[in-house]
Amino acid sequence: MVKQTKAKTFQAYLDSCHRRYSCVHCRAHLANHDDLISKSFQGSQGRAYLFNSVVNVGCGPAEERLLLTGLHAVADIYCENCHTTLGWKYEQAFELSQKYKEGKFIIELSHMIKDNGWD
């Protein structure tokens, strides 16, 4: 008989000397401030930030959505620790002016907090 166990998820920890953003629900690290591209985005629940890279985030399947800036293929992203949906990842932009978003991540402000080194 084989005993089934839940796979252990290992969290990434960002350097404590940098300003960072964490999940508001469980405090898992999400991104360094240095990876912030823009604060001028709109999520489904309000303001959102665009990041170049994130950690401790899982990705759902991509789907086409008509967003404020046109049609994009996006995948919902979620905190790997508490499984809260945080925003989405831009998989593909169909308009040339939006190509810079490909591979980037949107995290809604309602799901993250500033952590460490903010004065």
UniProtKB/Swiss-Prot annotation:
Biological process (GO), any one: spinal cord oligodendrocyte cell differentiation
GO molecular function: metal ion binding
Domain Yippee: 19-116
Pfam families: Yippee-Mis18
Keyword set includes Metal-binding: yes
PROSITE patterns xref list: YIPPEE
Residues noted as binding Zn(2+) in the record, renumbered to the chain: 23, 26, 79, 82
Family per similarity comment: Belongs to the yippee family.
Record function comment: May be involved in proliferation and apoptosis in myeloid precursor cells.
Name of the protein: Protein yippee-like 3
Record lineage: Eukaryota, Metazoa, Chordata, Craniata, Vertebrata
Recorded name of the encoding gene: ypel3
